[in-house]
Amino acid sequence: MRFGKVPGVLKGYQMKIAKICMTVTALALLAACGGGGDTDSSTKPIQTSTTEGFWTGTASTGNTVQLVVLENGETWGIYSRAGVLRGALYGNTTSASGTLSGSGLEFGSTGLASGSYSGTYTAKSTITVKTSDGGTFNGSYSSAYEQPASLSTLAGTYVGYVATKTASGSDSVTISNTGAIQAGSASTCLSTGTATPRASGKNVFDVSIKFAGSTCLLGNGTTVTGIAYYDTASRQVMTLALNSAKSDGLLFLGKK
């Protein structure tokens, strides 16, 4: 796992996606809160600062890394160079008292790369990560993570590009103001699912999408789960979701 070590990630998809690659944010790493003891009502819980949030920065490979670390430690993200998408990342991180560690997967057209990482951070400020194969990442926190996720803001039809580990293409996705997701058609591949604001109250949606049809890239009947982030300034959505085995998944970037 080296934030871009796998060559040719999402090959054939890169030039198309350059037009819409958005400045979402993201790697970072876990989130956890400590609780207070049985004291009187005037005593506030003690909170432990972690790496939860959106982070963006540059890796030693020269790629721009954009990742999100959820409150449960899951990390999701993309990396790009000069506006060209290079790949996707998924991992799990733990952090406390300014140090972090974790492991994850890097998805590319040639397969999967796995690895571990460790580093240091200042909560809601900066982060430094070193991977097991020598790669490094230095990132900064984005306060956009603090904005509540809104289904009414997310709703609309997005035109963009979708990719799996081995294939890519253009597509349009419609999301209703209740969070219903639909793309494709029953005659080829119909994708249906839901987007739900995370209970954390942050600017992240939980997504679940099921594919039905003989031409579906991930196979008929496959369900993927993951997250989505909507950037209000660019009117673009990023969705990253994996199958149950975490052996493949999809990346969608679209604009409405």
Briefly describe each language-model feature range.
Residues 127-134, 236-248:
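Short, exposed beta-strand-loop hairpins at the edges of beta-sheets
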